Every structure is written in C-alpha cells, then in structure tokens.
C-alpha cells in the first residue's frame, strides 16, 4: 500500500499551502446567527441595504470571498494528497490509480463487503481512507 501519492514538487508545495490555509480559515457564519433560534449558523450572503456585514466593515466578522479558496491544482484533494474515489464494491477498485488516488468505502457498504474491499485494496496497493479499526 503506497503511503504517499506521487506528486510533483509544485503540487507538494501547493498542498502544504492548502493545508495551512485550511487550518487558518475562519468559520463563516450567517449574519445574526446568534440572535434568532430559527437561524442556523450556515452561511447566507448578506443582502440588506444597510448591512454592515455586506459592506465589509472591519469590526464585523469576515465574509466569504475568493481569497479564502485553496489553490486550483490541489482543490478537492484529501489532505494526504490523494484524490478520493468512492467505492461500493471490489470491481470499483480496478478503476483506481494507486499512485494518485485513494479509496473511500461508501457508508452503505456492509461489514462483510467492506472487509473484502479492504483485502483487495491491500493486494492492489490502494490507500483506503476509512478503514475499519482492527
């Protein structure tokens, strides 16, 4: 089983930047999420005419912006650097490139089939993200 993906120097550098950005990224919350019970914390763009949050006033929390996005070359990759592929059965493992991709076993897969998938992944040298703890 390959522990690390084959990445170029540039991809490794961008992955480090992405992981650092992810740690620093603030939690974007909806305007006045604390005020009303019916408001979830999940982000909603402020659209009010006099909204201080929409106007990006400094004493307000940060607003979602393109500058918080991770580098395009490594966007969507697992923090380890592997691209995730969802696997439902043993046949799905055949389409995975073990040098660049890892497998995530679907939540709907039962324990018996999960063990079969993990054994076959070990034989093929494929990294499984959500292994059953032994």
From Swiss-Prot:
According to the UniProt entry, the coiled-coil residues are: none
Q: Among the record's GO biological process terms, what is one?
A: translation
Q: Name one GO cellular component term.
A: cytosolic large ribosomal subunit
GO molecular-function annotation terms?
structural constituent of ribosome
| Top-level lineage group | Archaea
Give the Pfam families listed for this entry. Answer: Ribosomal_L32e
Alphabetical keyword list: Ribonucleoprotein, Ribosomal protein
Q: PANTHER family given for it?
A: 60S RIBOSOMAL PROTEIN L32 AND DNA-DIRECTED RNA POLYMERASE II, SUBUNIT N (PTHR23413), RIBOSOMAL PROTEIN L32 (PTHR23413:SF1)
Tell me its family: Belongs to the eukaryotic ribosomal protein eL32 family.
Q: What name goes with this protein?
A: Large ribosomal subunit protein eL32
Give the organism's phylogenetic lineage: Archaea, Methanobacteriati, Thermoplasmatota, Thermoplasmata, Thermoplasmatales
Encoding gene, per UniProt annotation: rpl32e
């Amino acid at each position: 089983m390959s522990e690390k993906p084959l990445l170029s120097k540039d991809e490794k550098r961008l992955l480090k930047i992405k992981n650092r950005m992810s740690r620093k990224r603030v939690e974007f919350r909806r305007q006045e999420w604390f005020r009303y019970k019916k408001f979830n914390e999940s982000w909603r763009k402020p659209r009010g005419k006099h909204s201080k949050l929409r106007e990006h006033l400094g004493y307000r929390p940060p607003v979602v912006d393109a500058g918080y996005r991770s580098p395009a070359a490594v966007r969507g990759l697992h923090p380890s650097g592997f691209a995730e592929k969802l696997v439902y059965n043993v046949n799905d493992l055949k389409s995975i490139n073990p040098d660049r991709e890892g497998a995530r076993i679907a939540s709907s897969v039962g324990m018996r089939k999960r063990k079969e998938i993990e054994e076959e992944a070990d034989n093929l040298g494929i990294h499984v993200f959500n292994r059953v703890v032994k």
